[in-house]
Structure formats: structure tokens, C-alpha cells
């Protein structure tokens, strides 16, 4: 079972998504300094095998460039400005590498890492995705951060690939209901210890569809807790009363786009120091 040092663990989603500098070193430094418990970020691999922190398949939304990450070289990525949309004036900043975050994390040994694997083993992309996943894990092991790292993916195939090779050296973050993860050989309840709660259903065609109301029903929480799986609350809830309700149902971890505001709210509630 996931255990928080605080009554509620605050994870900074992409380092704090709402300020135009998501997944940058500036964002990560800011939220680590303010006292978050966990950094959530996204990793993709460039055409020449470097691990870059980028959420989207392309660089178009978050930088001044265009193109798929996996089609660009590191040299091309490093010419981009990932702070171009910042809500405050700041110097240009290239998208960081995973190793840059891991170097920064050495300064904050108590901060947990939530690493989302964004290259998926879709048809024709299997080799690339598994190569990327292995490279990420090898680097995490190299930096000795396994025990404070959660392997996170919407792809059940990626999660079980990592688990089969590295086992319990890492922690694992899945998505609930489990059908979101797609086809898997393993039962995620056998190794996943954090589940991001998504209010979704699967129609007769197997398509996963979101409910308009992002809050999952209370009856979803206790069965997970009984199996040692901690429900994680996603940024989509947006309203503090909904988060507070989830905390009362047993969740003790929140992934937020506004970590400073969330920390202030939790401190006011006596749920964080």
C-alpha cells in the first residue's frame, strides 16, 4: 500500500501544468522548493535514443517548434523553447532530459517521482516503445531512485513489461477502472499499488468513454483499499469539495495542476505540514 509521510501526498502534475512551463526544470525547481511530495512527469524518446520530458506526441503545443518527438533528434529538441507559453516573463528553456530531472532530484531525496511512459507499443511501434521503457528503467536504476519511483502508464503492456523485468524494484501506477489499461497478461491488482481514478465506462464496442462528471463513485474506493491499492485523485476534479470527499473515502494522494494552491488548502485543513 502507498504510504504518505503527510496525511495527503501532493504530486505536482507535470511540475504544475497551469502556468505555461509544464515539464520544465524551472517548474520542477519551483514545486520542489514549495514542498510538494512527488513530481509527476512524462517521458518520450527522441529519434536518436535520448529521453526527453514531454507529454504530447508532438512538441507543437508546449514549444515553439513542430513535429513528433520520436522523429526529432536531441539536437533538434534542444533548439526548442519549452517556456514560450509561460504566464510570467522568463528566459528561453529547452525541454529537459530525464537525467536533468534525476540530477535535480538528488537535491531533494525525499521527493517521490512519478514517471509516465508516453511511448506506447501500438502496432508498428512496439520495438520503439519497449526500447524506450527499458532505457527509462535503466536510467532510474543508474541513479538509484527505484524505491521512490512510480512507473506510470496508460498502457498495461508497458506496465507489465517493466514489472516482468524489474519486479518490485519499482512501485507501479495504473488507471482505474482497469480496462483503461487495455489488454494485459497480468492482473494489475497483483502489482499496481497506486490507481489514478478515472470516471469512465466501456461501451459495447470496447471504446473507453468519459462520464461528464469526473468524480468517481464512493463504492469504487474501498475495494481498492482492501487490496492495498491507493486511489489517486487526478487534476480533473478541479473543485476542492470533491477532493475533500475523496480524502474522506480513503485517498491520500492527489495529482494537481496547482500544487501551491493545493498545499495551501491541505494545510488549512490540517492534512499537510
Tell what function each PLM region has.
Residues 1-273:
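Phosphate-group recognition and catalysis centered on beta-loop-alpha active-site segments
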Amino acid at each position: 500500500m502507498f504510504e504518505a509521510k503527510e496525511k495527503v501526498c501532493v504530486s505536482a502534475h507535470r511540475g504544475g501544468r497551469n502556468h505555461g512551463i509544464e515539464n520544465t526544470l524551472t517548474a520542477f525547481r519551483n514545486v520542489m522548493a514549495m514542498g510538494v511530495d512527488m513530481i509527476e512527469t512524462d517521458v518520450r524518446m527522441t529519434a536518436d535514443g535520448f529521453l526527453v520530458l514531454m507529454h504530447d506526441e508532438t512538441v507543437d503545443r508546449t514549444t515553439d517548434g513542430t513535429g513528433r518527438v520520436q522523429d526529432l533528434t536531441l539536437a533538434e529538441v534542444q533548439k526548442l523553447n519549452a517556456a514560450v507559453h509561460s504566464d510570467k516573463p522568463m528566459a528561453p528553456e529547452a525541454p529537459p532530459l530525464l537525467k536533468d530531472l534525476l540530477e535535480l532530484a538528488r537535491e531533494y531525496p525525499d521527493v517521490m517521482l512519478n514517471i509516465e511512459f508516453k511511448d506506447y507499443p501500438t502496432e508498428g511501434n512496439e520495438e520503439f516503445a519497449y526500447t524506450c521503457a527499458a532505457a527509462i528503467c535503466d536510467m532510474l536504476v543508474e541513479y538509484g531512485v527505484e524505491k521512490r519511483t512510480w512507473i506510470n502508464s496508460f498502457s498495461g503492456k508497458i506496465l507489465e513489461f517493466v514489472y516482468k523485468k524489474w519486479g518490485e524494484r519499482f512501485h507501479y501506477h495504473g488507471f482505474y477502472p482497469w480496462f483503461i489499461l487495455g489488454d494485459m497478461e497480468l492482473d494489475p491488482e497483483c502489482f499496481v499499488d497506486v490507481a489514478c481514478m478515472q470516471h469512465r465506462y466501456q461501451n459495447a464496442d470496447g471504446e473507453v468513454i468519459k462520464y461528464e462528471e469526473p468524480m468517481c463513485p464512493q463504492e469504487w474506493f474501498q475495494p481498492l483499499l482492501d487490496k492495498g491499492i491507493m486511489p489517486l485523485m487526478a487534476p480533473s476534479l478541479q473543485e476542492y469539495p470533491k477532493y475533500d470527499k475523496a480524502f474522506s473515502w480513503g485517498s491520500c494522494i492527489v495529482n494537481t495542476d496547482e500544487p501551491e494552491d493545493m498545499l495551501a488548502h491541505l494545510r488549512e485543513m490540517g492534512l499537510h505540514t
